[in-house]
Protein backbone atom coordinates (compact mmCIF):
# COMPACT_ATOMS: atom_id res chain seq x y z
CA UNK A 1 0.00 0.00 0.00
CA UNK A 2 1.30 3.44 -0.96
CA UNK A 3 -0.75 6.26 0.51
CA UNK A 4 -2.40 8.86 -1.67
CA UNK A 5 -1.14 12.44 -1.49
CA UNK A 6 -4.64 13.35 -0.31
CA UNK A 7 -4.66 10.97 2.67
CA UNK A 8 -5.07 12.98 5.87
CA UNK A 9 -5.78 10.22 8.40
CA UNK A 10 -5.24 6.52 8.93
CA UNK A 11 -8.48 4.85 10.17
CA UNK A 12 -8.82 2.69 7.05
CA UNK A 13 -5.30 1.38 7.62
CA UNK A 14 -6.04 0.66 11.27
CA UNK A 15 -9.13 -1.28 10.18
CA UNK A 16 -6.93 -3.49 8.00
CA UNK A 17 -4.59 -4.05 10.94
CA UNK A 18 -7.44 -4.86 13.33
CA UNK A 19 -8.73 -7.50 10.92
CA UNK A 20 -5.25 -9.06 10.71
CA UNK A 21 -5.09 -8.66 6.94
CA UNK A 22 -1.49 -8.92 5.69
CA UNK A 23 -0.25 -5.73 4.11
CA UNK A 24 2.94 -3.81 3.45
CA UNK A 25 3.45 -0.08 3.14
CA UNK A 26 5.89 1.34 0.60
CA UNK A 27 6.94 4.75 -0.71
CA UNK A 28 4.30 7.03 0.86
CA UNK A 29 3.77 5.56 4.32
CA UNK A 30 2.19 6.24 7.70
CA UNK A 31 5.17 5.94 10.05
CA UNK A 32 3.14 5.20 13.18
CA UNK A 33 1.25 2.24 11.69
CA UNK A 34 3.07 -0.94 12.84
CA UNK A 35 3.22 -2.79 9.53
CA UNK A 36 6.12 -3.94 7.37
CA UNK A 37 7.49 -1.11 5.24
CA UNK A 38 9.75 -0.61 2.25
CA UNK A 39 11.21 2.86 2.37
CA UNK A 40 13.97 5.16 1.31
CA UNK A 41 15.59 7.76 3.53
CA UNK A 42 13.80 10.75 1.99
CA UNK A 43 15.43 13.19 4.37
CA UNK A 44 18.98 12.04 3.59
CA UNK A 45 18.25 11.87 -0.15
CA UNK A 46 16.86 15.41 -0.18
CA UNK A 47 19.83 16.67 1.81
CA UNK A 48 22.18 15.13 -0.76
CA UNK A 49 20.22 16.72 -3.63
CA UNK A 50 20.45 20.18 -2.07
CA UNK A 51 24.10 19.63 -1.19
CA UNK A 52 24.73 18.97 -4.88
CA UNK A 53 23.17 22.35 -5.74
CA UNK A 54 25.41 24.00 -3.15
CA UNK A 55 28.45 22.20 -4.55
CA UNK A 56 27.53 23.62 -7.96
CA UNK A 57 27.73 27.13 -6.50
CA UNK A 58 24.07 27.80 -5.68
CA UNK A 59 23.61 30.15 -2.73
CA UNK A 60 19.90 31.01 -2.80
CA UNK A 61 17.99 27.76 -3.11
CA UNK A 62 14.21 27.47 -3.33
CA UNK A 63 12.21 24.35 -2.53
CA UNK A 64 9.02 23.41 -4.35
CA UNK A 65 7.70 21.08 -1.68
CA UNK A 66 4.93 18.52 -1.66
CA UNK A 67 1.59 18.64 0.09
CA UNK A 68 1.59 19.13 3.87
CA UNK A 69 0.61 15.63 4.95
CA UNK A 70 2.56 12.93 3.07
CA UNK A 71 5.50 11.80 5.19
CA UNK A 72 7.89 11.79 2.25
CA UNK A 73 7.12 15.46 1.53
CA UNK A 74 7.80 16.34 5.17
CA UNK A 75 11.06 14.40 5.19
CA UNK A 76 12.28 15.96 1.92
CA UNK A 77 11.51 19.42 3.28
CA UNK A 78 13.49 18.63 6.43
CA UNK A 79 16.39 17.36 4.30
CA UNK A 80 16.36 20.65 2.38
CA UNK A 81 16.55 22.61 5.63
CA UNK A 82 19.32 20.40 7.01
CA UNK A 83 21.50 20.93 3.93
CA UNK A 84 21.12 24.69 4.21
CA UNK A 85 21.92 24.62 7.92
CA UNK A 86 25.04 22.48 7.47
CA UNK A 87 26.36 24.96 4.91
CA UNK A 88 25.60 28.09 6.90
CA UNK A 89 22.82 29.21 4.55
CA UNK A 90 19.91 30.85 6.43
CA UNK A 91 16.52 29.19 5.93
CA UNK A 92 13.98 31.55 4.35
CA UNK A 93 10.36 30.39 4.42
CA UNK A 94 9.63 32.73 1.49
CA UNK A 95 11.73 30.44 -0.71
CA UNK A 96 9.44 27.46 -0.02
CA UNK A 97 6.58 26.93 -2.49
CA UNK A 98 4.04 24.30 -1.32
CA UNK A 99 2.22 22.35 -4.03
CA UNK A 100 -1.56 22.07 -3.94
CA UNK A 101 -1.26 19.08 -6.25
CA UNK A 102 1.61 17.16 -7.80
CA UNK A 103 1.31 18.12 -11.47
CA UNK A 104 3.27 19.50 -14.43
CA UNK A 105 1.05 22.58 -14.27
CA UNK A 106 2.11 23.31 -10.69
CA UNK A 107 5.71 23.40 -11.87
CA UNK A 108 4.83 25.91 -14.58
CA UNK A 109 2.96 28.11 -12.09
CA UNK A 110 5.78 28.13 -9.56
CA UNK A 111 8.35 28.87 -12.28
CA UNK A 112 6.25 31.89 -13.30
CA UNK A 113 6.03 33.02 -9.67
CA UNK A 114 9.76 32.63 -9.09
CA UNK A 115 10.59 34.75 -12.15
CA UNK A 116 8.00 37.40 -11.29
CA UNK A 117 9.21 37.73 -7.70
CA UNK A 118 12.84 38.02 -8.86
CA UNK A 119 14.35 37.06 -5.50
CA UNK A 120 17.71 36.10 -6.96
CA UNK A 121 17.06 32.36 -6.69
CA UNK A 122 19.87 30.41 -8.36
CA UNK A 123 18.85 26.84 -7.49
CA UNK A 124 15.61 24.90 -7.02
CA UNK A 125 15.04 21.55 -5.33
CA UNK A 126 11.71 20.16 -6.55
CA UNK A 127 9.62 17.52 -4.71
CA UNK A 128 9.35 15.26 -7.76
CA UNK A 129 10.32 15.10 -11.43
CA UNK A 130 6.81 15.72 -12.79
CA UNK A 131 6.71 19.15 -11.16
CA UNK A 132 10.36 19.84 -12.04
CA UNK A 133 9.66 19.23 -15.73
CA UNK A 134 6.96 21.92 -15.56
CA UNK A 135 9.55 24.30 -14.11
CA UNK A 136 12.02 23.53 -16.91
CA UNK A 137 9.34 23.90 -19.59
CA UNK A 138 8.49 27.43 -18.45
CA UNK A 139 12.13 28.43 -18.04
CA UNK A 140 12.81 27.19 -21.59
CA UNK A 141 9.88 29.23 -22.88
CA UNK A 142 11.17 32.39 -21.17
CA UNK A 143 14.78 31.95 -22.23
CA UNK A 144 16.10 31.23 -18.74
CA UNK A 145 19.40 29.37 -19.00
CA UNK A 146 19.44 26.18 -16.96
CA UNK A 147 21.72 25.64 -15.12
CA UNK A 148 23.68 28.86 -15.75
CA UNK A 149 20.93 31.17 -14.43
CA UNK A 150 19.01 28.72 -12.25
CA UNK A 151 19.93 25.10 -11.54
CA UNK A 152 17.08 22.61 -11.03
CA UNK A 153 17.05 19.17 -9.43
CA UNK A 154 14.06 16.85 -9.08
CA UNK A 155 13.33 13.59 -7.29
CA UNK A 156 12.30 10.07 -8.44
CA UNK A 157 14.27 9.57 -11.68
CA UNK A 158 11.24 9.19 -13.92
CA UNK A 159 11.82 8.54 -17.63
CA UNK A 160 10.59 12.07 -18.36
CA UNK A 161 13.69 13.47 -16.62
CA UNK A 162 15.86 12.23 -19.50
CA UNK A 163 13.70 13.40 -22.41
CA UNK A 164 13.29 17.04 -21.36
CA UNK A 165 15.85 19.64 -22.44
CA UNK A 166 18.06 20.15 -20.53
CA UNK A 167 18.10 16.65 -19.04
CA UNK A 168 17.00 16.81 -15.42
CA UNK A 169 19.27 16.06 -12.49
CA UNK A 170 17.30 14.00 -10.00
CA UNK A 171 17.39 11.53 -7.12
CA UNK A 172 17.08 7.92 -8.20
CA UNK A 173 14.34 6.20 -6.22
CA UNK A 174 14.61 2.44 -6.87
CA UNK A 175 10.96 1.82 -7.77
CA UNK A 176 11.42 -1.68 -9.22
CA UNK A 177 13.43 -2.87 -6.23
CA UNK A 178 10.84 -1.31 -3.93
CA UNK A 179 8.07 -3.32 -5.59
CA UNK A 180 10.05 -6.57 -5.36
CA UNK A 181 10.85 -6.01 -1.68
CA UNK A 182 7.23 -5.14 -0.88
CA UNK A 183 5.99 -8.30 -2.59
CA UNK A 184 8.50 -10.47 -0.73
CA UNK A 185 7.53 -8.99 2.63
CA UNK A 186 3.84 -9.48 1.88
CA UNK A 187 4.39 -13.08 0.80
CA UNK A 188 6.40 -13.78 3.95
CA UNK A 189 3.63 -12.39 6.15
CA UNK A 190 0.93 -14.41 4.34
CA UNK A 191 2.93 -17.64 4.74
CA UNK A 192 3.60 -17.02 8.42
CA UNK A 193 -0.04 -16.23 9.17
CA UNK A 194 -1.22 -19.36 7.33
CA UNK A 195 1.08 -21.39 9.57
CA UNK A 196 -0.54 -19.78 12.58
CA UNK A 197 2.68 -18.08 13.56
CA UNK A 198 3.07 -14.53 14.76
CA UNK A 199 4.64 -12.04 12.40
CA UNK A 200 6.97 -9.24 13.41
CA UNK A 201 6.78 -6.31 10.97
CA UNK A 202 10.03 -5.59 9.14
CA UNK A 203 11.46 -2.43 7.62
CA UNK A 204 13.53 -2.56 4.44
CA UNK A 205 15.39 0.63 3.55
CA UNK A 206 16.68 0.97 -0.02
CA UNK A 207 19.53 3.21 -1.15
CA UNK A 208 19.07 6.31 -3.30
CA UNK A 209 21.52 8.13 -5.55
CA UNK A 210 21.80 11.65 -6.92
CA UNK A 211 21.82 11.45 -10.73
CA UNK A 212 23.74 14.45 -12.01
CA UNK A 213 22.66 15.69 -15.42
CA UNK A 214 22.45 18.85 -17.52
CA UNK A 215 20.05 20.88 -15.35
CA UNK A 216 22.63 21.34 -12.57
CA UNK A 217 26.03 20.62 -14.08
CA UNK A 218 27.67 24.02 -14.22
CA UNK A 219 31.07 24.60 -15.79
CA UNK A 220 33.66 25.66 -13.24
What feature does the model see in each segment?
Residues 1-5, 67:
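Structural motif
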Residues 10-220:
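Bacterial carbohydrate/catabolite-sensing allosteric modules
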Amino acid sequence: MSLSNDTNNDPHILEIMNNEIPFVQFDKIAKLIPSSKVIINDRKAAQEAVQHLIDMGCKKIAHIRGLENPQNAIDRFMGYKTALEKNGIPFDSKLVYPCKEITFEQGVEFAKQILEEDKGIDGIFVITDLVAVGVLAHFNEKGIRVPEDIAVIGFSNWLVSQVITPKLSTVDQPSYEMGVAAFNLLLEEIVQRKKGKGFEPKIVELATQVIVSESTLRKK
